[in-house]
């Protein structure tokens, strides 16, 4: 069966846009010199015991690494107040940096680029995760509405104006640490209802100081974080993830188009900014089928650099996005979680493993983490690049 798929793939390989090489145009020194356009999206996995990256993460990431591929880590905390889920990694201490180094080295040995996603949850937390049991911090003191899944979010404390520079500096120092750990760059997490987005969106920002009110004021904190991180490690090493259309964690904006456009405008001020990674609006159901709404086109046209689309893409939709010039690269989450050799499966148009959502956030170092099967068992060899798509 695999041989049949291989023959078919070789016949029409050039017709698979996801598996074409990508290099940033007009940037001869760019880090983004990729053999394909299938990215590992950042996904929280809750297996970094005591917030320290563990050796089993090296296997998880190298299973999904290919020569000339790009991986983004799970969300990684920038400070002691950044945590909102159990056993998520940090990049704020010497111990964290030293623990990341062998993981990053293992990914690099496979020939892949590795980006560290920098994260602060803000109010998406509870007192139990916070230092000394204090309230989580946010743009607001309004708590998140209970979600019906048993998650408890404590009432947050509104950050004072004079405290915000310290949070900005936490991101800067985390970026420095990530580079010291060997990462090729960082992705600032400005999406999915977490701290930066709590400031950006008008449903969760009720401030009356210079960080609230107008669109410019609401985005000020995020822009300061971007500027600080760029100043520390260089724009060529900094990307960002944004989700202006989403409504996660009670973070909704009354004008997502204006929000997204303003943020892209700020990114364009940094000539060599690594990439803009944006999440699609929620899926629509058309004729009984889930359909991506492709709401990111205005931002794609506006942004001057590499554009990454995410949000429910499959092989067909990803190929179309690249072929149409809608996105340069496509980030895959659950599909990549369940199919560690996803680029190879796309190349062969092979069947996919089904993911098990019951093991997404458990703490088992193997089950639901590194035990999803490859098409061929010999791909488990960490030093084998045969699961990379052919160029």
UniProtKB/Swiss-Prot annotation:
<dbReference type="InterPro" id="IPR045247">
    <property type="entry name" value="Oye-like"/>
</dbReference>
<feature type="binding site">
    <location>
        <position position="282"/>
    </location>
    <ligand>
        <name>substrate</name>
    </ligand>
</feature>
<protein>
    <recommendedName>
        <fullName>Putative 12-oxophytodienoate reductase 6</fullName>
        <ecNumber>1.3.1.-</ecNumber>
    </recommendedName>
</protein>
<keyword id="KW-0276">Fatty acid metabolism</keyword>
<dbReference type="InterPro" id="IPR001155">
    <property type="entry name" value="OxRdtase_FMN_N"/>
</dbReference>
<dbReference type="GO" id="GO:0010181">
    <property type="term" value="F:FMN binding"/>
</dbReference>
<feature type="binding site">
    <location>
        <begin position="333"/>
        <end position="334"/>
    </location>
    <ligand>
        <name>FMN</name>
    </ligand>
</feature>
<keyword id="KW-0444">Lipid biosynthesis</keyword>
<keyword id="KW-0521">NADP</keyword>
<feature type="binding site">
    <location>
        <begin position="189"/>
        <end position="192"/>
    </location>
    <ligand>
        <name>substrate</name>
    </ligand>
</feature>
<dbReference type="InterPro" id="IPR013785">
    <property type="entry name" value="Aldolase_TIM"/>
</dbReference>
<keyword id="KW-0925">Oxylipin biosynthesis</keyword>
<feature type="binding site">
    <location>
        <begin position="42"/>
        <end position="44"/>
    </location>
    <ligand>
        <name>FMN</name>
    </ligand>
</feature>
<dbReference type="GO" id="GO:0031408">
    <property type="term" value="P:oxylipin biosynthetic process"/>
</dbReference>
<dbReference type="Pfam" id="PF00724">
    <property type="entry name" value="Oxidored_FMN"/>
</dbReference>
<feature type="binding site">
    <location>
        <position position="241"/>
    </location>
    <ligand>
        <name>FMN</name>
    </ligand>
</feature>
<feature type="active site" description="Proton donor">
    <location>
        <position position="194"/>
    </location>
</feature>
<keyword id="KW-0560">Oxidoreductase</keyword>
<feature type="compositionally biased region" description="Acidic residues">
    <location>
        <begin position="382"/>
        <end position="391"/>
    </location>
</feature>
<keyword id="KW-0288">FMN</keyword>
<keyword id="KW-0443">Lipid metabolism</keyword>
<dbReference type="GO" id="GO:0016491">
    <property type="term" value="F:oxidoreductase activity"/>
</dbReference>
<feature type="binding site">
    <location>
        <position position="75"/>
    </location>
    <ligand>
        <name>FMN</name>
    </ligand>
</feature>
<comment type="function">
    <text>Putative oxophytodienoate reductase that may be involved in the biosynthesis or metabolism of oxylipin signaling molecules.</text>
</comment>
<keyword id="KW-0285">Flavoprotein</keyword>
<feature type="binding site">
    <location>
        <position position="117"/>
    </location>
    <ligand>
        <name>FMN</name>
    </ligand>
</feature>
<keyword id="KW-0275">Fatty acid biosynthesis</keyword>
<dbReference type="GO" id="GO:0009695">
    <property type="term" value="P:jasmonic acid biosynthetic process"/>
</dbReference>
<feature type="binding site">
    <location>
        <position position="312"/>
    </location>
    <ligand>
        <name>FMN</name>
    </ligand>
</feature>
<feature type="region of interest" description="Disordered">
    <location>
        <begin position="372"/>
        <end position="391"/>
    </location>
</feature>
<comment type="similarity">
    <text>Belongs to the NADH:flavin oxidoreductase/NADH oxidase family.</text>
</comment>
């Amino acid at each position: 069966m695999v041989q049949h798929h291989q023959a078919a793939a070789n016949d029409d390989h050039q017709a698979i846009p996801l598996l074409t090489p990508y290099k940033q145009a007009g940037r001869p020194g760019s880090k983004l010199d990729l053999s394909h356009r299938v990215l590992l999206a950042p996904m929280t996995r809750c297996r970094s015991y005591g917030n320290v990256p563990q050796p089993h993460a090296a296997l998880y990431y190298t299973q999904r690494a290919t020569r000339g591929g790009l991986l983004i880590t799970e969300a990684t905390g920038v400070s002691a107040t950044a945590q909102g889920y159990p056993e998520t990694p940090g990049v704020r201490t010497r111990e964290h940096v030293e623990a990341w180094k062998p993981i990053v080295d293992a990914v690099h040995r496979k020939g892949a680029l590795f980006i560290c996603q920098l994260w602060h949850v803000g109010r998406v937390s509870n007192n139990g995760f916070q230092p000394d049991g204090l309230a989580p911090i946010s743009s607001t003191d309004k708590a998140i509405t209970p979600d019906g899944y048993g998650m408890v979010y404590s009432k947050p404390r509104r950050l004072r104006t004079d405290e915000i520079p310290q949070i900005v500096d936490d991101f800067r120092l985390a970026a420095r640490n990530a580079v010291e750990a060997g990462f090729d760059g960082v992705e600032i997490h400005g999406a999915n209802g977490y701290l930066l987005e709590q400031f950006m969106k008008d449903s969760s920002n009720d401030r009356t100081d210079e960080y609230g009110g107008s669109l410019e004021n609401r985005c000020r904190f995020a822009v300061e974080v971007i500027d600080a991180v760029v100043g520390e490690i260089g724009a060529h090493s900094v990307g960002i993830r944004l989700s202006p259309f989403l409504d996660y964690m009670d973070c909704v904006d009354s004008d997502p188009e204006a929000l997204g456009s303003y943020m892209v405008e700020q990114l364009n001020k940094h000539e060599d900014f690594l990439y803009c990674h944006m999440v699609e609006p929620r899926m629509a159901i058309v004729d009984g089928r889930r359909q991506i709404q492709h709401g990111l086109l205005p931002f794609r046209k506006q942004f001057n650099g590499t554009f990454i689309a995410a949000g429910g893409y499959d092989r067909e939709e990803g190929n179309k996005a690249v072929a149409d010039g809608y996105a340069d690269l496509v980030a895959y989450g659950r599909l990549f979680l369940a199919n560690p050799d996803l680029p190879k499966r796309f190349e062969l148009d092979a069947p996919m493993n089904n993911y098990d959502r019951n093991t997404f956030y458990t703490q088992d170092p193997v089950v639901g983490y590194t035990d999803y099967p490859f098409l061929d068992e010999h791909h488990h060899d960490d030093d084998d690049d045969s699961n990379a798509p052919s160029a």
